[in-house]
Amino acid sequence: MSGAEQQQIVPANNGDENWKAGLNLPAKDRRFKTADVTDTKGVEFEDFCLGRDLLMGIFEKGWEKPSPIQEASIGVALTGQDILARAKNGTGKTGAYCIPVIEKIQPALKAIQAMVIVPTRELALQTSQICVELSKHIQLKVMVTTGGTDLRDDIMRLNGTVHLVIATPGRILDLMEKGVAKMEHCKTLVLDEADKLLSQDFQGILDRLINFLPKERQVMLYSATFPNTVTSFMQKHMHKPYEINLMEELTLLGVTQYYAFVQEKQKVHCLNTLFRKLQINQSIIFCNSTQRVELLAKKITEIGYSCYYIHSKMAQNHRNRVFHDFRQGNCRNLVCSDLLTRGIDIQAVNVVINFDFPRNAETYLHRIGRSGRFGHLGVAINLITYEDRHTLRRIEQELRTRIEPIPKTVDPKLYVADQQLVDAADETTA
């Protein structure tokens, strides 16, 4: 370890606790959290010997203690070992890799030192924002590059200093092949939502991309599901990866799942009833096609509710604006296609509605994971037609989960934040 690296690591147990007093901490989240994020061994962020500036960013982001995937992953990632990690959606996977990636970057070296690849533009923007917030006390330059934006802007930014790149595969490969994104110092590669990145959609791109990286590199894969393609990728590009599997149950413990049998023509009426009866903070409503997304959004507006819609055929700047405004809470309901099933973290979403039931278990798992984020509670409601009945049972069996008939009244304690508050006195005795 070099002298510069040694100076970066400041053990937090050095007796000087005064630095914490000056932190600008957000309000403490007193909502109930499930074992998906609380079932840990009691490790603290300080125990990883992270630099103080990074610790300040972690605490000021409101992250108090590592979740199970962070606890299992951060220490190993800091050693430089390859990682293959399976954990549920919404349990802190992004922090599990962002923290060690940022810690290992040397700001004095004005070159790309780490790259995070994600499958969608929205996830790239979200991940880059997290990295910026975590590293706000460090002189770190984070760049996000995705398709659908001006290539010339990316080229100009790469002419300056960039330490960490968050990218979708096609765009960053294009920049590498043009000789603009120079990767000789990029010794860390993270694939987030790795199952999607290793699917047919991106076939061949990752192999070409990895050829631009140094031979001595660290590769980390994070996902909720790992298809067979992961095995061949692992054998080809990874060296004795450390395997983490926190997937004994596939669905989030905090998401209660219901179904309602309806005829196709009754779906909008049923949705209207749900809007009236449920205490929705924010909801995401999934359809199986972009055309149905637009039609449903129009219907929802006609029956008197505000809603946004988003799908993959919209212009990128329009998608960005809708996504940003929904995150800010400017609208209660968002109708979308499966574009938004992966990694998107909007903590205010407490209800997910499958207006159209998904065709496979993997899509179902990712959709319902948009509620119940980071151990909080939420509900997923599935509108099931006669044709969907066999798919419903098959998905239940594949995910080893139970989807119950929806009761006349859904208990607010299952999904309403105000009903989930943990009393401060209870917390001290817990």
UniProtKB/Swiss-Prot annotation:
Short sequence motif named Q motif, residue ranges: 43-71
Enzyme class: hydrolase
Protein's GO biological process: apoptotic process; determination of adult lifespan; gamete generation; mRNA metabolic process; negative regulation of apoptotic process; negative regulation of translation; oogenesis; P-body assembly
Stretches assigned to the Helicase C-terminal domain: 254-414
E.C. designation(s): 3.6.4.13
Residues at which ATP binds: 87-94
Alphabetized GO MF terms: ATP binding; ATP hydrolysis activity; mRNA binding; RNA helicase activity
Keyword Membrane on entry: no
Gene3D superfamilies in UniProt: P-loop containing nucleotide triphosphate hydrolases (3.40.50.300)
Tissue: Expression is restricted to two germline precursors Z2 and Z3 in L1 stage hermaphrodites, and is detectable specifically in the gonad at low levels into the L3 stage. Expression is significantly higher during the early L4 stage. In adults, expression remains gonad-specific and was not apparent in the somatically derived uterus. Expressed in germ granules (P granules); when associated with pgl-1.
Superkingdom per UniProt: Eukaryota
Keywords carried by this UniProt record: Apoptosis, ATP-binding, Cytoplasm, Developmental protein, Differentiation, Helicase, Hydrolase, Nucleotide-binding, Oogenesis, RNA-binding, Spermatogenesis
Catalysed reactions listed for this entry: ATP + H2O = ADP + phosphate + H(+)
Location(s), subcellular: Cytoplasm
Domain Helicase ATP-binding: 74-244
Function: Probable RNA helicase required for oocyte and sperm function. Also required to prevent the physiological germline apoptosis mechanism killing essentially all developing oocytes.
Similarity annotation: Belongs to the DEAD box helicase family. DDX6/DHH1 subfamily.
Assembly mode: Interacts with car-1 in a germline ribonucleoprotein complex. Interacts with ifet-1. Interacts with oma-1, which is a component of a ribonucleoprotein complex, in an RNA-dependent manner.
PANTHER family for this protein: DEAD-BOX ATP-DEPENDENT RNA HELICASE 50
Protein name: ATP-dependent RNA helicase cgh-1
